[in-house]
Amino acid sequence: MSRAAYLILENGTVFEGKAFGAEKETTGELVFTTAMTGYLETLTDPSYYGQVVIQTFPLIGNYGVIPADFESDSPSLKGYIVREWCQVPSNFRCEGDLDTFLKESGIPGIYGIDTRALTRIVREYGVLNCKISYSPDVTKEELDEIKNYVITEAVESTTIKEKEHFDAENGDLNVVLMDFGAKLNIGRELVKRGCNLTVVPAHTTADEIKAMNPDGVMLSNGPGDPSDNTEIIAELKKLCDFGIPTFGICLGHQLLALSQGAKTEKLKYGHRGANQPAKEVETGRVYITSQNHGYAVVSDSMPENGKVSFVNGNDNTCEGVNYTNMPAFSVQFHPEACGGPHDTAFLFDRFIELMKNNRK
Protein backbone atom coordinates (compact mmCIF):
# COMPACT_ATOMS: atom_id res chain seq x y z
CA MET A 1 0.00 0.00 0.00
CA SER A 2 1.34 3.41 -0.99
CA ARG A 3 2.45 5.85 1.68
CA ALA A 4 0.51 9.10 2.15
CA ALA A 5 2.20 12.11 0.58
CA TYR A 6 1.39 15.81 0.76
CA LEU A 7 1.88 18.74 -1.57
CA ILE A 8 2.27 21.92 0.48
CA LEU A 9 1.87 25.21 -1.39
CA GLU A 10 3.58 28.42 -0.30
CA ASN A 11 0.17 29.90 0.60
CA GLY A 12 -0.38 27.11 3.14
CA THR A 13 -2.77 25.00 1.06
CA VAL A 14 -2.15 21.26 1.49
CA PHE A 15 -3.15 18.52 -0.98
CA GLU A 16 -3.10 14.88 0.13
CA GLY A 17 -2.21 12.06 -2.23
CA LYS A 18 -0.13 8.90 -2.33
CA ALA A 19 3.60 8.57 -2.89
CA PHE A 20 5.24 6.97 -5.89
CA GLY A 21 8.71 7.25 -7.34
CA ALA A 22 11.54 8.17 -4.98
CA GLU A 23 10.44 8.87 -1.42
CA LYS A 24 12.18 12.09 -0.44
CA GLU A 25 11.11 15.58 0.47
CA THR A 26 11.78 18.29 -2.10
CA THR A 27 10.97 21.94 -2.77
CA GLY A 28 10.41 23.45 -6.20
CA GLU A 29 8.44 25.81 -8.42
CA LEU A 30 5.00 24.37 -9.21
CA VAL A 31 4.00 24.45 -12.91
CA PHE A 32 1.57 22.53 -15.11
CA THR A 33 1.69 21.06 -18.61
CA THR A 34 -1.42 20.43 -20.70
CA ALA A 35 0.23 17.81 -22.93
CA MET A 36 -1.88 14.64 -23.27
CA THR A 37 1.07 12.51 -24.43
CA GLY A 38 4.85 12.81 -24.31
CA TYR A 39 5.25 12.41 -20.55
CA LEU A 40 8.70 10.87 -21.05
CA GLU A 41 9.80 13.91 -23.04
CA THR A 42 8.41 16.11 -20.26
CA LEU A 43 10.24 14.18 -17.55
CA THR A 44 13.57 14.40 -19.39
CA ASP A 45 13.29 17.98 -20.70
CA PRO A 46 16.08 20.00 -19.00
CA SER A 47 13.88 23.12 -19.17
CA TYR A 48 11.95 21.75 -16.15
CA TYR A 49 15.04 22.06 -13.94
CA GLY A 50 14.05 23.09 -10.42
CA GLN A 51 10.32 22.64 -10.99
CA VAL A 52 7.57 20.33 -9.73
CA VAL A 53 5.43 19.42 -12.73
CA ILE A 54 1.67 18.77 -12.76
CA GLN A 55 0.28 16.69 -15.63
CA THR A 56 -3.24 17.98 -16.32
CA PHE A 57 -4.12 14.87 -18.35
CA PRO A 58 -5.55 12.43 -15.77
CA LEU A 59 -3.87 9.12 -16.69
CA ILE A 60 -0.10 9.02 -17.13
CA GLY A 61 2.29 6.14 -17.81
CA ASN A 62 0.14 4.07 -20.17
CA TYR A 63 2.98 3.18 -22.52
CA GLY A 64 5.65 2.81 -19.86
CA VAL A 65 9.25 3.95 -20.15
CA ILE A 66 10.91 4.11 -23.58
CA PRO A 67 14.53 5.36 -23.38
CA ALA A 68 14.60 6.13 -27.12
CA ASP A 69 12.08 8.90 -26.42
CA PHE A 70 14.17 10.65 -23.76
CA GLU A 71 15.17 14.28 -24.39
CA SER A 72 18.20 14.09 -22.07
CA ASP A 73 20.10 11.41 -20.19
CA SER A 74 18.14 11.93 -16.98
CA PRO A 75 15.35 14.09 -15.48
CA SER A 76 16.12 17.57 -14.12
CA LEU A 77 12.74 18.33 -12.52
CA LYS A 78 12.25 18.30 -8.73
CA GLY A 79 8.94 16.41 -8.50
CA TYR A 80 6.04 14.96 -10.48
CA ILE A 81 2.30 15.23 -9.79
CA VAL A 82 -0.35 13.10 -11.54
CA ARG A 83 -3.98 12.18 -11.00
CA GLU A 84 -3.39 8.49 -11.75
CA TRP A 85 -0.43 6.49 -13.01
CA CYS A 86 -0.72 3.29 -15.01
CA GLN A 87 0.81 0.41 -13.07
CA VAL A 88 0.59 -2.07 -15.96
CA PRO A 89 1.87 -0.23 -19.06
CA SER A 90 1.49 -1.76 -22.51
CA ASN A 91 3.62 -0.91 -25.54
CA PHE A 92 5.88 -2.96 -27.77
CA ARG A 93 8.75 -0.52 -27.05
CA CYS A 94 8.17 -0.44 -23.28
CA GLU A 95 11.21 -1.16 -21.08
CA GLY A 96 9.79 -0.39 -17.65
CA ASP A 97 7.16 1.43 -15.62
CA LEU A 98 6.94 5.03 -14.46
CA ASP A 99 7.26 4.31 -10.74
CA THR A 100 10.53 2.40 -11.16
CA PHE A 101 11.94 5.06 -13.49
CA LEU A 102 11.22 7.84 -10.99
CA LYS A 103 12.77 5.79 -8.17
CA GLU A 104 15.93 5.15 -10.20
CA SER A 105 16.12 8.85 -11.14
CA GLY A 106 15.63 10.09 -7.58
CA ILE A 107 12.45 12.00 -8.46
CA PRO A 108 9.59 11.98 -5.91
CA GLY A 109 6.03 11.83 -7.19
CA ILE A 110 2.49 12.08 -5.86
CA TYR A 111 -0.61 10.52 -7.40
CA GLY A 112 -4.25 10.60 -6.35
CA ILE A 113 -4.28 14.40 -6.12
CA ASP A 114 -7.10 16.42 -7.69
CA THR A 115 -4.86 17.84 -10.43
CA ARG A 116 -7.77 19.76 -11.93
CA ALA A 117 -8.27 21.77 -8.72
CA LEU A 118 -4.51 22.17 -8.29
CA THR A 119 -4.07 23.49 -11.83
CA ARG A 120 -6.89 25.99 -11.34
CA ILE A 121 -5.05 27.38 -8.30
CA VAL A 122 -1.88 27.89 -10.35
CA ARG A 123 -3.91 29.41 -13.19
CA GLU A 124 -5.64 31.85 -10.81
CA TYR A 125 -2.74 32.84 -8.56
CA GLY A 126 0.22 32.22 -10.86
CA VAL A 127 3.26 30.03 -10.37
CA LEU A 128 3.69 28.99 -6.73
CA ASN A 129 6.51 27.35 -4.86
CA CYS A 130 5.68 24.05 -3.19
CA LYS A 131 7.06 21.18 -1.16
CA ILE A 132 6.51 17.45 -1.46
CA SER A 133 6.34 16.10 2.10
CA TYR A 134 5.18 13.04 4.00
CA SER A 135 3.58 14.99 6.83
CA PRO A 136 0.63 17.40 6.50
CA ASP A 137 1.97 19.55 9.31
CA VAL A 138 3.96 22.61 8.31
CA THR A 139 5.59 25.25 10.49
CA LYS A 140 5.91 28.95 9.72
CA GLU A 141 9.65 28.44 9.21
CA GLU A 142 8.97 25.70 6.65
CA LEU A 143 6.47 27.92 4.81
CA ASP A 144 9.03 30.73 4.72
CA GLU A 145 11.57 28.30 3.28
CA ILE A 146 9.10 27.27 0.57
CA LYS A 147 8.28 30.91 -0.27
CA ASN A 148 11.96 31.82 -0.52
CA TYR A 149 12.86 29.01 -2.91
CA VAL A 150 14.59 30.34 -6.05
CA ILE A 151 15.88 28.39 -9.05
CA THR A 152 19.60 29.15 -9.36
CA GLU A 153 22.45 28.04 -11.64
CA ALA A 154 19.90 26.48 -13.97
CA VAL A 155 21.91 26.60 -17.20
CA GLU A 156 25.15 25.65 -15.43
CA SER A 157 23.42 22.57 -14.02
CA THR A 158 22.02 21.31 -17.34
CA THR A 159 24.63 22.18 -19.98
CA ILE A 160 27.18 19.62 -21.12
CA LYS A 161 30.65 19.82 -19.59
CA GLU A 162 32.73 18.93 -22.66
CA LYS A 163 32.34 19.57 -26.38
CA GLU A 164 30.72 16.77 -28.41
CA HIS A 165 30.62 16.18 -32.17
CA PHE A 166 28.19 14.29 -34.43
CA ASP A 167 28.72 13.76 -38.16
CA ALA A 168 25.79 13.61 -40.56
CA GLU A 169 25.70 11.25 -43.52
CA ASN A 170 27.01 13.30 -46.46
CA GLY A 171 26.97 16.35 -44.22
CA ASP A 172 27.97 19.56 -45.98
CA LEU A 173 27.05 22.14 -43.32
CA ASN A 174 28.76 22.62 -39.97
CA VAL A 175 26.59 23.82 -37.09
CA VAL A 176 27.57 24.73 -33.54
CA LEU A 177 24.81 24.03 -31.01
CA MET A 178 25.16 26.07 -27.82
CA ASP A 179 23.78 23.81 -25.11
CA PHE A 180 21.84 25.77 -22.48
CA GLY A 181 19.98 22.58 -21.50
CA ALA A 182 19.28 21.30 -25.00
CA LYS A 183 16.65 18.74 -25.89
CA LEU A 184 18.20 15.91 -27.89
CA ASN A 185 15.74 16.24 -30.75
CA ILE A 186 17.12 19.64 -31.75
CA GLY A 187 20.38 17.93 -32.66
CA ARG A 188 18.55 15.06 -34.38
CA GLU A 189 16.62 17.49 -36.60
CA LEU A 190 19.85 19.18 -37.69
CA VAL A 191 21.82 15.97 -38.31
CA LYS A 192 19.07 14.38 -40.40
CA ARG A 193 19.13 17.51 -42.58
CA GLY A 194 22.82 17.00 -43.36
CA CYS A 195 24.41 19.14 -40.65
CA ASN A 196 27.61 18.06 -38.94
CA LEU A 197 26.93 19.06 -35.35
CA THR A 198 29.31 20.31 -32.68
CA VAL A 199 27.62 20.71 -29.29
CA VAL A 200 29.41 23.13 -26.98
CA PRO A 201 28.94 24.11 -23.31
CA ALA A 202 26.86 27.18 -22.55
CA HIS A 203 29.81 29.38 -21.57
CA THR A 204 31.78 28.82 -24.78
CA THR A 205 32.97 32.25 -25.94
CA ALA A 206 32.11 33.97 -29.21
CA ASP A 207 35.76 33.85 -30.28
CA GLU A 208 35.94 30.10 -29.61
CA ILE A 209 32.85 29.55 -31.74
CA LYS A 210 34.17 31.76 -34.55
CA ALA A 211 37.41 29.74 -34.55
CA MET A 212 35.36 26.61 -35.39
CA ASN A 213 34.32 28.33 -38.64
CA PRO A 214 30.69 27.14 -38.49
CA ASP A 215 28.09 27.70 -41.19
CA GLY A 216 25.56 28.42 -38.46
CA VAL A 217 24.91 28.58 -34.73
CA MET A 218 21.91 27.04 -32.97
CA LEU A 219 20.93 28.45 -29.57
CA SER A 220 19.11 25.78 -27.57
CA ASN A 221 16.30 25.73 -25.07
CA GLY A 222 17.06 25.62 -21.36
CA PRO A 223 15.78 26.39 -17.85
CA GLY A 224 15.61 29.38 -15.56
CA ASP A 225 15.37 33.16 -15.77
CA PRO A 226 17.05 34.26 -19.03
CA SER A 227 18.24 37.56 -17.54
CA ASP A 228 20.41 35.68 -15.02
CA ASN A 229 22.81 34.68 -17.81
CA THR A 230 24.70 37.97 -18.14
CA GLU A 231 28.00 36.48 -19.33
CA ILE A 232 26.28 34.38 -22.00
CA ILE A 233 24.25 37.39 -23.19
CA ALA A 234 27.45 39.44 -23.57
CA GLU A 235 29.08 36.67 -25.63
CA LEU A 236 25.99 36.37 -27.85
CA LYS A 237 26.09 40.11 -28.55
CA LYS A 238 29.67 39.69 -29.72
CA LEU A 239 28.79 36.56 -31.70
CA CYS A 240 26.05 38.43 -33.58
CA ASP A 241 28.65 40.94 -34.80
CA PHE A 242 30.40 38.10 -36.67
CA GLY A 243 27.42 37.68 -39.02
CA ILE A 244 27.10 33.91 -38.58
CA PRO A 245 23.57 32.59 -39.36
CA THR A 246 21.85 31.98 -36.02
CA PHE A 247 18.65 30.22 -34.97
CA GLY A 248 17.39 30.43 -31.37
CA ILE A 249 14.79 28.21 -29.70
CA CYS A 250 13.01 28.90 -26.38
CA LEU A 251 15.71 30.11 -23.93
CA GLY A 252 17.99 30.63 -26.94
CA HIS A 253 15.33 32.93 -28.41
CA GLN A 254 15.19 34.93 -25.17
CA LEU A 255 18.96 35.20 -24.80
CA LEU A 256 19.34 36.37 -28.40
CA ALA A 257 16.72 39.08 -27.82
CA LEU A 258 18.41 40.17 -24.58
CA SER A 259 21.73 40.44 -26.42
CA GLN A 260 20.09 42.94 -28.78
CA GLY A 261 18.74 45.12 -25.99
CA ALA A 262 15.25 43.67 -25.51
CA LYS A 263 13.72 42.76 -22.14
CA THR A 264 12.07 39.61 -20.82
CA GLU A 265 9.25 39.17 -18.30
CA LYS A 266 7.96 36.32 -16.16
CA LEU A 267 4.54 35.04 -17.21
CA LYS A 268 1.79 34.41 -14.67
CA TYR A 269 1.77 30.64 -15.20
CA GLY A 270 3.71 30.14 -18.42
CA HIS A 271 2.98 28.18 -21.56
CA ARG A 272 3.58 24.45 -21.18
CA GLY A 273 2.04 21.76 -23.36
CA ALA A 274 1.94 20.27 -26.84
CA ASN A 275 -1.14 22.19 -27.98
CA GLN A 276 -0.21 25.88 -27.83
CA PRO A 277 -1.32 28.13 -30.73
CA ALA A 278 1.28 30.41 -32.33
CA LYS A 279 0.21 32.88 -35.03
CA GLU A 280 2.63 33.93 -37.76
CA VAL A 281 2.33 37.71 -37.98
CA GLU A 282 3.08 38.00 -41.71
CA THR A 283 0.55 35.41 -42.92
CA GLY A 284 -1.96 35.25 -40.06
CA ARG A 285 -1.63 31.47 -40.11
CA VAL A 286 -1.92 29.70 -36.76
CA TYR A 287 0.30 26.71 -35.96
CA ILE A 288 -0.19 24.28 -33.08
CA THR A 289 3.12 24.11 -31.24
CA SER A 290 4.89 22.46 -28.34
CA GLN A 291 5.91 24.97 -25.65
CA ASN A 292 7.62 24.97 -22.28
CA HIS A 293 8.51 28.38 -20.92
CA GLY A 294 7.74 30.64 -17.99
CA TYR A 295 9.32 33.80 -19.43
CA ALA A 296 8.69 35.78 -22.61
CA VAL A 297 10.37 38.52 -24.61
CA VAL A 298 8.57 41.85 -24.14
CA SER A 299 7.42 42.73 -27.67
CA ASP A 300 7.50 46.49 -27.10
CA SER A 301 11.11 46.30 -25.91
CA MET A 302 12.48 44.94 -29.19
CA PRO A 303 14.93 47.28 -30.98
CA GLU A 304 14.25 48.40 -34.55
CA ASN A 305 16.31 45.53 -35.97
CA GLY A 306 14.02 42.93 -34.33
CA LYS A 307 10.59 42.27 -35.84
CA VAL A 308 8.10 40.07 -33.99
CA SER A 309 7.33 37.14 -36.31
CA PHE A 310 5.02 34.96 -34.16
CA VAL A 311 2.64 35.75 -31.30
CA ASN A 312 0.85 33.42 -28.90
CA GLY A 313 -2.74 32.79 -29.91
CA ASN A 314 -3.98 32.95 -26.32
CA ASP A 315 -2.29 36.01 -24.81
CA ASN A 316 -0.54 37.66 -27.78
CA THR A 317 2.92 37.44 -26.17
CA CYS A 318 6.02 37.29 -28.37
CA GLU A 319 6.67 33.83 -29.85
CA GLY A 320 9.28 34.68 -32.47
CA VAL A 321 11.61 37.37 -33.84
CA ASN A 322 13.24 37.98 -37.22
CA TYR A 323 16.33 40.22 -37.26
CA THR A 324 16.92 42.65 -40.12
CA ASN A 325 20.55 43.60 -39.42
CA MET A 326 21.96 40.08 -39.25
CA PRO A 327 21.17 36.56 -40.53
CA ALA A 328 19.29 35.49 -37.42
CA PHE A 329 15.82 34.50 -36.26
CA SER A 330 14.33 32.80 -33.23
CA VAL A 331 11.14 31.25 -31.86
CA GLN A 332 9.82 30.76 -28.35
CA PHE A 333 8.11 27.44 -29.12
CA HIS A 334 9.73 24.09 -29.97
CA PRO A 335 9.77 23.29 -33.72
CA GLU A 336 11.60 20.03 -32.92
CA ALA A 337 8.44 18.98 -30.99
CA CYS A 338 9.14 15.74 -29.07
CA GLY A 339 6.54 15.45 -27.78
CA GLY A 340 4.13 17.46 -29.80
CA PRO A 341 3.09 18.47 -33.31
CA HIS A 342 5.57 18.83 -36.16
CA ASP A 343 3.74 21.77 -37.77
CA THR A 344 6.71 24.13 -37.50
CA ALA A 345 9.56 21.74 -38.36
CA PHE A 346 9.94 23.77 -41.57
CA LEU A 347 11.85 26.33 -39.48
CA PHE A 348 14.85 23.98 -39.49
CA ASP A 349 14.68 24.01 -43.30
CA ARG A 350 14.57 27.81 -43.17
CA PHE A 351 17.76 27.72 -41.09
CA ILE A 352 19.41 25.41 -43.63
CA GLU A 353 18.46 27.80 -46.44
CA LEU A 354 19.80 30.76 -44.45
CA MET A 355 23.17 29.04 -44.00
CA LYS A 356 23.43 28.06 -47.67
CA ASN A 357 22.54 31.56 -48.86
CA ASN A 358 25.14 33.03 -46.51
CA ARG A 359 27.79 30.87 -48.17
CA LYS A 360 27.19 32.43 -51.58
Place the predicted regions along the sequence by residue.
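Proline-centered loop/turn at the N-terminus of a beta-strand
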Residues: 108, 174, 245-247, 263, ...
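Structural signature of beta-strand start/N-cap positions in the alpha/beta core
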Residues: 196, 245, 288, 327-329
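RNA-binding accessory domains that recognize and position tRNA/RNA substrates
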Residues: 1-207, 211-212, 226, 338, ...
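Cysteine-nucleophile active-site neighborhood
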Residues: 211, 215-216, 220-288, 296, ...
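Catalytic beta-strand/loop cores that center a nucleophilic Ser/Cys/Thr
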Residues: 284-326
